[in-house]
């Protein structure tokens, strides 16, 4: 045994001072002194358990002692009666055996291959023992999980990575995948659980037993992220679910990882063989598969970027020429040719490397250089980790640990060790470049593009350095990284084919580049990722955004400006087609062309296919809404024009819905026979409120009433003859149904018909005569106020003229001023008590004092008060033009009318923009104070003082 170097002899004196009396210096062998000087982990362990050192001296570690691990552990667990005891014994056993392995490794008592075997077998022994103990405990608690035939179902554990390959390093975490064979339920327990519940609960307990730190440490850090769907997927999957996933969604890196997968414990059982046979076709293709080279090149590029980004210098695993590159070289041959060459299907690296050389896939010299380098690097890695039982592959920067490694690796000093290390890593790098290679050097533009690709594909953490996000605040930067990570997790839950992933990987760097250039990057990205989640399984939409950069830019700008638009696009991705043509996107249909465009649009759909007709109506409306909102955001439509467009669109919809309902009713019952001698349908739709007043907003409902002029004795002329007035009732019911039916594209409009005579208690459709009689003899003042903002939005000229005459007659009735003032004011006060002041320290733009409703009540009051003197006041139904009429007819001073108009349009504009932001219609208390004061003054003048 090589004597300790000078720095280590000096350090030994520090060790002596720590040793308790039972471990006096004079009682220790030279071997013990060497190991205790090299490894703080061994030092701490034997100080806590001096008997372990005695055991090491009397029974030194042997190369084949791994064969006894299971028996030794079984004995240690024989008296365990609860989970806490299980956790303690597993931790103590792991530490005791790791001390023995560290002893053998430090003194080079066994080969490096033997060390890897011992480390891997120890992990497997501990995992299997914990699983078997917990399985029995869980069966006692919940019953035994069985399949449909009553056969007990086991939990199978796939050891992945180095654990699966039998090449575990000293301080490694363990990558596991849990599976069970068949669905079924537990039998014999206090209550029945299905197998998924049983194994999920058991899996959670198994992870806790192995992973949870206690005063005795932990057994292994458990990583379950290699399972299907990653962290977002089920903890345990049935064989069928595993097979479905790998057949439909398995990705290149998962295929790469599965090469080393090994079933822990009884690997020759029926279920183990079934699982292996199921996974083999996914891992090893029947044909020679050269696409693997680019996939592995991409993975290596990702690792290289991580090394640069996280500043991982002197990393013997991930650095150029490190352990990972040797693994990549070997697995290239396994994945390309393993399906045709069963001898390449080994999980362990060194036997596979020998096979590669025997098949002349690599030269003997290259294969030998890789073998020697691998053993050198793995010994260095394990020694490095055994100093403190620490998971690291980065060479130390302090003199003590450098001296320790140089001595243990049998070099005179640190420079000699690093010189040999450089030689080995250079050899590895040469073979790697010849076989896999790196992409050619990048231009500055390509480098920037690569950084965006890195941001998307490499799942950066918050502490990563991300130069492309340097311009963002720390909070925004963290939020962007979190959004990307959450989006990737969400993708794992979706069934996305290879083409979809390819398109997404092309799209996302461009999208992130554009979004993250914005100051509001985090907000915009949150809206767009919500949209993308809805379309990732529909490759056509991804391709649209990927192939048309202009469409992507429009999407980003619209989503940034309006969450309402983002929500609409997310709900109805068909609207993405609208982004292709900016000429139509930001240029809404002419106000008088909506009916014609809708008619043309509906010609594509069979007239007798009600479902497609309903869907087409909704799709047309959403596309037009998007255009109006886009123009609104772009500033090309003032508030009055926005409402005009929304109103014309609604009227076109009403026209089409009445047409559909009419065709359906006539097909069923025939036409009312009073129409035989005249044109038209004898039917009208009257719009009230915002529709009647040309003031619709983006989410406004429609206040409608239905009128007809059908005589009492009219009948329909179809085979199924019914009363004419019954026909119009069913027509109105059908119209309501067509508006409110929810399809995949939602409903068309919410319709409120409660403003009809007698409200909800009245008939849904009313004759023109009955309507006139009601308005003259029964209607309340508030119903006459509502009539101010009413107009026919669909109907025969004859019926329209009748309604207009009734409206004019009612509005021009002479009214006693004080009585009217009191009734209007009291109605407003009731509304305010019911709707206003609901939001403390906020101003409700519509309902609170000084808001929109006050202006509407002022105009309605003045029309009802003065129309008998000035009949021209009845001409318009919208507030802005009514205010113009009041000024023109000398009821209101022109200045006051202008002030109220400006306040009204300003407040309406704010409501539109709040709707685009999906925000409620209230603002901070100190907003619009000037407008509100002017409205209050006008209210006081007309409805209080006069």
From Swiss-Prot:
Spell out the residue ranges making up region: Adenylyl transferase.
Answer: 449-946
Task: State the name under which the record lists this protein.
Answer: Bifunctional glutamine synthetase adenylyltransferase/adenylyl-removing enzyme
Q: What is its EC number?
A: 2.7.7.89, 2.7.7.42
NCBIfam families on file = PRK11072.1 (NF008292)
GO biological process terms, semicolon-separated: regulation of glutamine family amino acid metabolic process
Q: Which GO terms describe its molecular function?
A: [glutamate-ammonia-ligase] adenylyltransferase activity; [glutamine synthetase]-adenylyl-L-tyrosine phosphorylase activity; ATP binding; magnesium ion binding
Q: Which family does it belong to?
A: Belongs to the GlnE family.
Question: Which Pfam families does this UniProt record tie to the protein?
Answer: GlnD_UR_UTase (PF08335), GlnE (PF03710)
Cofactor(s) needed by this chain = Mg(2+)
- Where does this protein come from, organism-wise? Escherichia fergusonii (strain ATCC 35469 / DSM 13698 / CCUG 18766 / IAM 14443 / JCM 21226 / LMG 7866 / NBRC 102419 / NCTC 12128 / CDC 0568-73)
In terms of CDD domains, this protein maps to:
NT_GlnE_GlnD_like (cd05401)
What GO cellular component is one of the record's annotations? cytosol
Enzyme class name: transferase
Q: Reaction catalysed by this chain? A: [glutamine synthetase]-O(4)-(5'-adenylyl)-L-tyrosine + phosphate = [glutamine synthetase]-L-tyrosine + ADP; [glutamine synthetase]-L-tyrosine + ATP = [glutamine synthetase]-O(4)-(5'-adenylyl)-L-tyrosine + diphosphate
Write out the ranges of the annotated region (Adenylyl removase): 1-440
Q: Which InterPro entries match?
A: GlnE, GlnE_rpt_dom, NT_sf, PII_UdlTrfase/GS_AdlTrfase
Q: Which UniProt keywords apply?
A: ATP-binding, Magnesium, Multifunctional enzyme, Nucleotide-binding, Nucleotidyltransferase, Transferase
Domain of life the protein comes from? Bacteria
Q: What does this protein do?
A: Involved in the regulation of glutamine synthetase GlnA, a key enzyme in the process to assimilate ammonia. When cellular nitrogen levels are high, the C-terminal adenylyl transferase (AT) inactivates GlnA by covalent transfer of an adenylyl group from ATP to specific tyrosine residue of GlnA, thus reducing its activity. Conversely, when nitrogen levels are low, the N-terminal adenylyl removase (AR) activates GlnA by removing the adenylyl group by phosphorolysis, increasing its activity.
Its lineage opens with:
Bacteria, Pseudomonadati, Pseudomonadota, Gammaproteobacteria, Enterobacterales
């Amino acid at each position: 045994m090589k004597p300790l170097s000078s720095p280590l002899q000096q350090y030994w004196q520090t060790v002596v001072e720590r040793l308790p009396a039972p471990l006096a210096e004079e009682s220790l062998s030279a071997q013990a002194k060497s190991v205790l000087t090299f490894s703080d982990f061994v030092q701490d362990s034997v100080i806590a358990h001096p008997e372990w050192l005695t055991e090491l001296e009397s029974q030194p570690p042997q190369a084949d002692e791994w064969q006894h691990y299971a028996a030794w552990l079984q004995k240690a667990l024989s008296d365990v009666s609860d989970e806490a005891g299980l956790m303690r014994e597993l931790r103590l056993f792991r530490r005791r055996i790791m001390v023995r392995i560290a002893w053998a490794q430090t003194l080079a008592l066994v080969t490096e291959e033997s060390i890897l075997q011992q480390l891997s077998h120890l992990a497997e022994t501990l995992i299997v023992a914990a699983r078997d103990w917990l399985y029995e405990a869980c069966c006692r608690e919940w019953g035994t999980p069985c399949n449909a035939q009553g056969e007990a179902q086991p939990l199978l554990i796939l050891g992945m990575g180095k654990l699966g390959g039998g090449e575990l390093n000293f301080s490694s975490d363990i990558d596991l995948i849990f599976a069970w064979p068949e669905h079924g339920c537990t039998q014999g327990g206090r209550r029945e659980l299905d197998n998924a519940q049983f194994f999920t609960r058991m899996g959670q307990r198994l992870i806790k037993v192995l992973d949870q730190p206690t005063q005795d440490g932990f057994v292994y850090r458990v990583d379950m992220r290699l399972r299907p769907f990653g962290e977002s997927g089920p903890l345990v999957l049935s064989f069928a679910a595993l097979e479905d996933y790998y057949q439909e969604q398995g990705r290149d890196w998962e295929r790469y990882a599965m090469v080393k997968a090994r079933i822990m414990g009884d690997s020759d059982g029926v279920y183990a063989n079934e699982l292996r046979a199921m996974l083999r076709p996914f891992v090893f293709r029947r044909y020679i598969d050269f696409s693997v080279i680019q996939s592995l090149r991409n993975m290596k590029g990702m690792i290289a970027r991580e090394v640069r980004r996280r500043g991982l210098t002197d990393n013997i695993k991930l650095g150029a020429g490190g352990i990972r590159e040797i693994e990549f070289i070997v697995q290239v041959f396994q994945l390309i040719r393993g399906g045709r060459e069963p001898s390449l299907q080994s999980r362990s690296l060194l036997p596979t490397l020998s096979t590669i050389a025997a098949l002349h896939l690599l030269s003997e010299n290259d294969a030998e250089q890789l073998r020697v380098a691998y053993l050198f690097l793995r010994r260095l890695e394990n020694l490095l980790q055994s100093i403190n039982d620490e998971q690291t592959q980065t060479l130390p920067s302090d003199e003590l640990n450098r001296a320790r490694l140089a001595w243990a690796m049998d070099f005179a000093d640190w420079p000699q060790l690093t010189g040999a290390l450089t030689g080995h890593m250079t050899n590895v790098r040469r073979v790697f470049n010849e076989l896999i290679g790196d992409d050619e050097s990048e231009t500055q533009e390509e480098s920037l593009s690569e950084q965006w690709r890195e941001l998307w594909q490499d799942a950066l953490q918050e502490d990563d350095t991300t130069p492309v996000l340097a311009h963002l605040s720390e909070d925004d930067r963290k939020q962007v990284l979190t959004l990307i990570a959450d989006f990737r997790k969400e993708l794992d839950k979706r069934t996305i084919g290879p083409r979809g992933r390819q398109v997404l990987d092309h799209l996302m760097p461009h999208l992130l580049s554009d979004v993250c250039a914005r100051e509001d990057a985090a907000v915009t990205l949150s809206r767009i990722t919500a949209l993308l989640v809805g379309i990732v399984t529909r490759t056509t939409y991804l391709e649209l955004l990927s192939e048309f950069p202009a469409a992507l830019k429009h999407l980003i700008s619209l989503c940034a400006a309006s969450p309402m638009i983002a929500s609409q696009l997310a709900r109805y991705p068909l609207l993405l087609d609208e982004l292709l043509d900016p000429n139509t996107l930001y240029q809404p249909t002419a106000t008088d062309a909506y009916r014609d465009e809708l008619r043309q649009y509906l010609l594509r759909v069979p007239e007798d296919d009600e479902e497609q007709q309903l869907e087409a109506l909704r799709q047309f409306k959403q596309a037009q809404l998007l255009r109006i909102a886009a123009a609104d955001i772009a500033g090309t439509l003032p508030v009055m024009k926005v409402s005009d467009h929304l109103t014309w669109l609604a009227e076109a919809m009403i026209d089409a819905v009445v047409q559909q309902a009419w065709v359906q009713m006539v097909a069923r019952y025939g036409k009312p026979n009073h129409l035989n001698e005249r044109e038209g349908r004898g039917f009208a739709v009257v719009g009230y409120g915002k529709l009647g007043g040309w003031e619709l907003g983006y989410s406004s409902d429609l206040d409608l009433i239905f009128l007809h002029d059908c005589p009492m004795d009219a009948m329909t002329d179809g085979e199924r003859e019914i009363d004419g007035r019954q026909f119009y009732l069913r027509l109105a019911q059908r119209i309501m149904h067509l508006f409110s039916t929810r399809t995949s594209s939602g409903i068309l409009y919410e319709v409120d018909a409660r403003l009809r005579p007698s409200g909800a208690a009245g008939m849904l459709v009313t004759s023109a005569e009955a309507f006139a009689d009601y308005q003259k003899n029964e209607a309340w003042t508030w119903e006459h106020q509502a009539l101010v903002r009413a107009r026919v939005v669909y109907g025969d000229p004859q019926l329209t003229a009748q309604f207009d005459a009734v409206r004019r007659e009612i509005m021009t009735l002479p009214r006693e001023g004080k009585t009217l003032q009191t009734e209007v004011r009291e109605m407003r006060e009731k509304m305010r008590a019911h709707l206003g002041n609901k939001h403390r320290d906020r101003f409700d733009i519509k309902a609170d004092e000084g808001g929109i409703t006050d202006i509407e009540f002022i105009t309605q009051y003045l029309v009802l008060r003065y129309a008998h003197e000035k009949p021209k006041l009845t001409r318009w139904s919208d507030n802005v033009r009514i205010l113009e009429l009041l000024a023109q007819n000398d009821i209101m001073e022109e200045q006051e009318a202008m002030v109220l108009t400006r306040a009204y349009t300003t407040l309406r504009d704010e409501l539109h923009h709040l709707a685009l932001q999906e925000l409620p219609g209230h603002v901070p208390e100190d907003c619009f104070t000037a407008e509100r004061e002017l409205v209050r003054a006008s209210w006081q003048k007309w409805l209080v003082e006069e």
